[in-house]
């Protein structure tokens, strides 16, 4: 009898097809997130669970899933999962690093360019008919923004995504500053990046991109005090997690001109609506789509499947998050 896996959203078919060869697969096909009560019902008889960032996988879920042996998160981040509790119960947790790195780094630069060059504002100007109504073909002071070439970029968080952002910055001949919990000496040599304390990165950079995981240390690390350190011409881009930035302080910074603009792909709560923030024309907003490319999402689905198939075969999953769980339970659905 095949082990049963429940997938909380319709991921790309390539991953589902791989899983169907080895598992009994059930997929939540609706566009909306699975309701909490329905999730608790569905996990009662599953051996494996594929989850999205929008699902909170905590003690309550584990208590309702006596057969659950592995949770495969369809994301690189896993702050939606109580990993400590999973480990205590001998439940393996995996994620999808690397495969979405380029897509997310691309999106960071898309937000940076869109904000620096008023792309969205210009688009609205044309679509609304305002350009036609003005009857002016071109004006030397319209939509003045900032060039990226030769400027200083500050990258907060210098893991895979942070370093991929730095590689793109090299193409713009930018000076690269970074802040990370640990020095990355090899990356410094490869990319010509310079380590600085966080406060110095904020002070010196023309553009700041946030690429840190959400932890106790990074929660609201960009607050009013630190926003005031930035240049009034600076642009902040957040492709990390919404709670890395104090939204109220950011709104104040954008309104009062402490910084020139912001590009945000992540928010404190998702889905998100904030009339005060959304009314500002110096911020570009996208709905958490950093990894939204055909290539990345299919690669994520394949990696999810590879993790589950490896576990089923008694092998350590390729991207195991909680490696200490191996001491508690060997991989495989028959292991106790």
Curated annotation (Swiss-Prot):
Task: Give the keywords, sorted.
Answer: Cytoplasm, NAD, Oxidoreductase
Catalyzed chemical reaction(s) = glycolate + NAD(+) = glyoxylate + NADH + H(+)
Q: Which residues form the active site?
A: 241, 270, 288 (proton donor)
A Gene Ontology molecular function term of the record: glyoxylate reductase (NADPH) activity
A GO CC annotation recorded here is:
cytosol
InterPro entries xrefs: D-isomer_2-hydroxyacid_DH, D-isomer_2_OHA_DH_cat_dom, D-isomer_DH_CS, D-isomer_DH_CS1, D-isomer_DH_NAD-bd, Glyoxylate_reductase_GyaR, NAD(P)-bd_dom_sf
Q: Which residues form a coiled coil?
A: none
Per the record, the major location class is cytoplasm
Q: What is its EC number?
A: 1.1.1.26
The record's section on SUPFAM superfamilies has: Formate/glycerate dehydrogenase catalytic domain-like (SSF52283), NAD(P)-binding Rossmann-fold domains (SSF51735)
Family note:
Belongs to the D-isomer specific 2-hydroxyacid dehydrogenase family. GyaR subfamily.
Its subunit composition reads: Homodimer.
Protein name in the entry = Glyoxylate reductase
| Organism of derivation | Pyrococcus furiosus (strain ATCC 43587 / DSM 3638 / JCM 8422 / Vc1)
């Amino acid at each position: 009898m095949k082990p049963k896996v429940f997938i909380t959203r319709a991921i790309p078919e390539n991953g589902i097809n791989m899983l169907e060869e080895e598992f009994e697969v059930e997929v939540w096909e609706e566009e909306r997130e699975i309701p909490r009560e329905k999730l608790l019902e569905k996990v009662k008889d599953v051996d494996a669970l594929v989850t999205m960032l929008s699902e909170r996988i905590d003690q309550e879920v584990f208590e309702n899933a006596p057969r659950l042996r592995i949770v495969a998160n369809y994301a690189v981040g896993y702050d939606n999962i109580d990993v400590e509790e999973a480990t205590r119960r001998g439940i393996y947790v995996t994620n999808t690093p690397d495969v979405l790195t380029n897509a997310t780094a691309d999106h960071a630069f898309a937000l940076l360019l869109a904000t620096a060059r008023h792309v969205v504002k210009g688009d609205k100007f044309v679509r609304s008919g305002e350009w036609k109504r003005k009857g002016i073909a071109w004006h030397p002071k319209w939509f003045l923004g900032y060039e990226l070439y030769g400027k200083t970029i500050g990258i907060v968080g210098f893991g895979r995504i942070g370093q991929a952002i730095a590689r793109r910055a090299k193409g713009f001949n930018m000076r690269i500053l970074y802040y990370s919990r640990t020095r990355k000496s090899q990356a410094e040599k490869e990319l010509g990046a310079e380590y600085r304390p966080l406060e110095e990165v904020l002070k010196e950079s023309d553009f700041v991109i946030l690429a840190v995981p959400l932890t106790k240390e990074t929660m609201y690390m960009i607050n009013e005090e630190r926003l005031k350190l930035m240049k009034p011409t600076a642009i902040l881009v957040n492709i990390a997690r919404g709670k890395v930035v104090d939204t109220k302080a950011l709104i104040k910074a954008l309104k009062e001109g402490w910084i020139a603009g912001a590009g945000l792909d992540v928010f404190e709560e998702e889905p998100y609506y904030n009339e005060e923030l959304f009314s500002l024309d110096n911020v570009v907003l996208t709905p958490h789509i950093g990894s939204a490319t055909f290539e990345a999402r299919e690669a994520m689905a394949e990696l999810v499947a590879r993790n589950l198939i490896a576990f089923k075969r008694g092998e350590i999953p390729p991207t195991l998050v909680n490696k200490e769980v191996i001491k508690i339970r060997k991989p495989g659905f028959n292991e106790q």
